[in-house]
């Protein structure tokens, strides 16, 4: 969930409006789902000099979260659905449609080498599409040995369990050193390692030898891809890319394709949550059977 989108945007606006007088600070932490411990979950808290006013502010925010709980669910599209919708939107021309390949986000611990969206782009014959950043050092080495303009047979994502095999054109080669101008990295120089742009049909894949999530348009440009000229951009990231890409995007879609970081917390193998904590907005409550068994054993 991004704070730029609803319901986060209006919720945090209300939170800021309540920070007045004796209420020094209010906070809402939705909870980082890749953390399996009893206290994991959303929390509203605050600091102030008047306990009554502070409690009213915290209670108001808590009630808003609970009453509108299901609004915090994210609509995920399958890889095929996301590509079809992006192609439909892009027919109007203008700015690119961005697809977040959220479950293959290396910033959350994924491998950045899943091919579900590449399969979908090629299958649906997407035009002027680009994917980044795809981590495959072996493919990068083959491309650099073959040279720019060469045609190479490759199996991308061989270690992912769902590889993509095909003949690619090596469109560009790079050292992967790039200067970033976006608001996330603010002028930093980033080393992506040896990098290449591989094209199959009209789909371009920026492949790197270092695992980095897509968060700056410079990560495309270093491989010769101009993101503003693409119809579809598939970013292996969840939220960090938005600061630099939303200004050029006509829409941002979130795809639930193959990848190692479950985007829906209900899909995670919880073991240690507090009893009764719902595993997703409006979802089933967690029941810690192990803790109940341990307690029964101690009582016995």
Give the residues covered by each predicted segment.
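Extended hydrophobic packing segments that form well-structured cores
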Residues: 44, 66, 182-300
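Hard-cation-handling environments
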Residues: 1-202, 206-207
């Amino acid at each position: 969930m991004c704070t730029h989108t609803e319901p986060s945007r209006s919720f945090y606006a209300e939170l800021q409006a309540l920070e007045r007088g004796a209420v020094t600070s209010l906070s809402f932490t939705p909870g980082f789902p890749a953390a399996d411990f009893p206290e994991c979950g959303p929390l509203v808290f605050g600091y102030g000099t008047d306990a009554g006013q502070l409690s009213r502010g915290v209670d108001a925010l808590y009630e808003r979260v609970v009453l509108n709980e299901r609004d915090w669910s994210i609509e995920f599209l399958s890889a095929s659905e996301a590509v079809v919708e992006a192609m439909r939107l892009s027919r109007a021309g203008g700015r690119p449609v961005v697809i977040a390949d959220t479950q293959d986000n290396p910033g959350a611990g994924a491998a950045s080498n899943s091919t579900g969206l590449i399969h979908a782009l090629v299958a649906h014959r997407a035009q002027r599409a680009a994917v980044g950043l795809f981590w495959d050092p072996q493919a990068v080495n083959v491309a650099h040995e073959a040279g720019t303009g060469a045609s190479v047979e490759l199996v991308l994502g061989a270690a992912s369990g769902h590889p993509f095999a095909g003949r690619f054109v090596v469109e560009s080669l790079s050292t992967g050193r790039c200067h970033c101008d976006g608001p996330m990295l603010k002028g930093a120089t980033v080393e992506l390692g040896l990098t290449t742009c591989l094209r199959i049909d009209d789909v371009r894949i920026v492949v790197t030898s270092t695992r980095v999530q897509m968060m700056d348009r410079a990560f495309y440009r270093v491989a010769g891809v101009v993101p503003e000229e693409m119809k579809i951009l598939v970013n292996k990231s969840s939220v960090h890319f938005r600061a630099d890409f939303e200004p050029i995007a006509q829409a941002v879609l979130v795809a639930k394709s193959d990848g190692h970081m479950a985007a829906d917390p209900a899909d995670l193998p919880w073991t240690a949550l507090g009893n009764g904590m719902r595993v997703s907005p409006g979802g089933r409550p967690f029941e810690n059977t192990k803790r109940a068994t341990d307690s029964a054993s101690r009582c016995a």
